[in-house]
C-alpha cells in the first residue's frame, strides 16, 4: 500500500512544482469551500472517533482536542484561506549575480518534493499541513494519530476531491488511513519517495524516527522551556510573564516548565509567586531551597523529583529551582533543556546578552514570554512544526522551511576556461 502511495506522491510532486501561485491559491480556496460544503460527512467520522476514544478512557481534555464542531471546522477552512494570503516563497531568487566568466548565476527557492508528516491526534493538523505543503508545491503523505484516523480519512477525501476538481492528482495529498503502527516503521524507510519527514508527537516518536528513519528528519516540538528570574528582575512584570507562559495554554510546547530563580531575589520573589500561582491553580514542584520558602504560602507545593526537570508537563505544573546565578541557570538549561524556548527576566544588559549568546535554543527571549514561539506570532503565518534542531530549519517552520533551493546558471554559449 505505501509503495503505491509513494509512487503517486512523487508523480504528483512534479506537477505541483510547476504551478503558479495563482493556481495553488485556487486549489486552496476550493479545499476551504469543500470543507464547509461537506461538514456533515467530516463531523460524522469525527463523532465515531470521539465515541471510540471515550470508550478507551481518554481524558476529557484529550477528547476536547479530538472533537470537531461546525464552528471549529469553519475556523479550519478559514485558516486555509489565510494561507492563500501568505507570500509564496517558491521561485524567489535568494541571491545571485554575473560571474567574471560571463555566467549569470542565481539561487532560487524550489519545493522539497514529498513531505511525510507523522502527528498527534489533532484533526486540524491534517488540513494545516496539507495546505502548507500545497502552497509550497509539495506533495504530502500524512499519518495522523490512531484516535482520529476516521476523521483524517474523511478530511483527506475532501481535499482529494478538491484537487481533482482543479485538475490535479489526488496523490498530491494522501493519508495512511490504517491505525496499524507497523505502517509507521514502513513509512520511515520510504526514502525513495519521501524527501523530508516531520514527526509531531512525544519523545518516543521522535526517538523512533531519529533511530529508524532512512529519510532526513526534522524533529522538534518537545518543549522543556525555562524562565530564569535574575536578581535585577522587577517582580510584578516578571509575574505577569510567568503567568502567561504557564497558564495561557498549558498543553502547548512553548509553555514554561521550569522556573529558575536567582538566590538573591528568592526571598522577595517566591512569596509573590506563591500567591499568583495559587490564584492560577498551578502546582509548584520545588527544590529543597525553594520548598523551604514556599511551603508556608498559599500555592500547592510538592518536592520536585530529579526526573521532573526533564519532563514536559503540558499541565498546570511548574518546577521551581533556586540557582546561585546566571552561570548556574545556563548550566541547568544546557543539561535539561530541549533547545526549544528559554527566557531571562532581567534589567541587566550584560546578563541579557550573555543569556542570549550562551543558551543554545531555537528561540531565546529577554523579558518576554516563551509563548511567542509560534509561526503566527513570528509573522510567518501558519507553521507545520517547531524545529529544535539546526538543519535545515530551526524554530517555527513556516513556508520557507518547506522549500530548498537550486543553483541556476544562464550562459551565452559560456564555457569554463
Swiss-Prot record:
Catalytic activity: L-glutamate 5-semialdehyde + phosphate + NADP(+) = L-glutamyl 5-phosphate + NADPH + H(+)
Enzyme category, top tier: oxidoreductase
UniProt KW NADP keyword: yes
Signal peptide: none
Entry's EC annotation: 1.2.1.41
GO molecular function, one term: glutamate-5-semialdehyde dehydrogenase activity
Subcellular location(s) of the protein: Cytoplasm
Family matches, as PANTHER family: DELTA-1-PYRROLINE-5-CARBOXYLATE SYNTHASE (PTHR11063:SF8), GLUTAMATE SEMIALDEHYDE DEHYDROGENASE (PTHR11063)
Described purpose of this protein according to its UniProt entry: Catalyzes the NADPH-dependent reduction of L-glutamate 5-phosphate into L-glutamate 5-semialdehyde and phosphate. The product spontaneously undergoes cyclization to form 1-pyrroline-5-carboxylate.
Family according to the record: Belongs to the gamma-glutamyl phosphate reductase family.
UniProt protein name: Gamma-glutamyl phosphate reductase
Organism: Citrobacter koseri (strain ATCC BAA-895 / CDC 4225-83 / SGSC4696)
Amino acid at each position: 500500500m505505501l509503495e503505491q502511495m509513494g509512487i503517486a506522491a512523487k508523480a504528483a510532486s512534479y506537477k505541483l512544482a510547476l504551478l503558479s501561485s495563482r493556481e495553488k491559491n485556487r486549489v486552496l480556496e476550493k479545499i476551504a469551500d469543500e470543507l464547509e460544503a461537506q461538514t456533515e460527512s467530516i463531523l460524522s467520522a469525527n463523532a465515531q472517533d470521539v465515541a471510540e476514544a471515550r470508550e478507551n478512557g481518554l481524558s476529557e481534555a484529550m477528547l476536547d482536542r479530538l472533537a470537531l464542531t461546525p464552528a471549529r471546522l469553519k475556523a479550519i477552512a478559514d485558516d486555509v484561506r489565510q494561507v492563500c494570503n501568505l507570500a509564496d516563497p517558491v521561485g524567489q531568487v535568494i541571491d545571485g549575480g554575473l560571474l567574471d566568466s560571463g555566467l549569470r548565476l542565481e539561487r532560487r527557492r524550489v519545493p522539497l518534493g514529498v513531505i511525510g508528516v507523522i502527528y498527534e491526534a489533532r484533526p486540524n493538523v491534517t488540513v494545516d499541513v496539507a495546505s502548507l505543503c500545497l502552497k509550497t508545491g509539495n506533495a504530502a503523505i500524512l499519518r495522523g494519530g490512531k484516535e482520529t484516523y476516521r476523521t483524517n480519512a474523511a478530511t483527506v477525501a475532501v481535499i482529494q476531491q478538491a484537487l481533482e476538481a482543479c485538475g490535479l492528482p489526488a496523490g498530491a495529498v494522501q493519508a495512511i488511513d490504517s491505525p496499524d503502527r507497523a505502517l509507521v516503521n514502513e513509512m520511515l524507510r520510504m526514502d525513495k519517495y519521501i524527501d523530508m519527514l516531520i514527526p509531531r508527537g512525544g519523545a518516543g516518536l521522535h526517538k523512533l524516527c531519529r533511530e529508524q528513519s532512512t529519510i532526513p528528519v526534522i524533529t522538534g516540538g518537545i518543549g522543556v522551556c525555562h524562565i530564569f528570574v535574575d536578581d535585577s528582575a522587577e517582580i510584578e512584570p516578571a509575574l505577569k510573564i510567568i503567568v502567561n507562559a504557564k497558564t495561557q495554554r498549558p498543553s502547548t510546547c512553548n509553555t514554561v516548565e521550569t522556573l529558575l530563580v536567582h538566590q538573591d531575589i528568592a526571598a522577595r520573589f517566591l512569596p509573590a509567586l506563591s500567591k499568583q500561582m495559587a490564584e492560577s491553580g498551578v502546582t509548584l514542584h520545588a527544590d529543597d531551597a525553594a520548598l523551604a520558602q514556599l511551603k508556608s504560602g498559599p500555592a500547592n507545593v510538592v518536592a520536585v523529583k530529579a526526573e521532573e526537570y526533564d519532563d514536559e508537563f503540558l499541565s498546570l505544573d511548574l518546577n521551581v529551582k533556586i540557582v546561585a546565578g546566571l552561570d548556574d541557570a545556563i548550566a541547568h538549561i544546557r543539561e535539561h533543556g530541549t533547545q526549544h524556548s528559554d527566557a531571562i527576566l532581567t534589567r541587566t544588559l550584560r546578563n541579557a546578552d550573555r543569556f542570549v549568546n550562551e543558551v543554545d535554543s531555537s528561540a531565546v527571549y529577554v523579558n518576554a514570554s516563551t509563548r511567542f514561539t509560534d509561526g503566527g506570532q513570528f509573522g510567518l503565518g501558519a507553521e507545520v512544526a517547531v524545529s529544535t534542531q539546526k538543519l535545515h530549519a530551526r524554530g517555527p517552520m513556516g513556508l520557507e522551511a518547506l522549500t530548498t533551493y537550486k543553483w541556476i546558471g544562464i550562459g551565452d554559449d559560456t564555457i569554463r576556461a
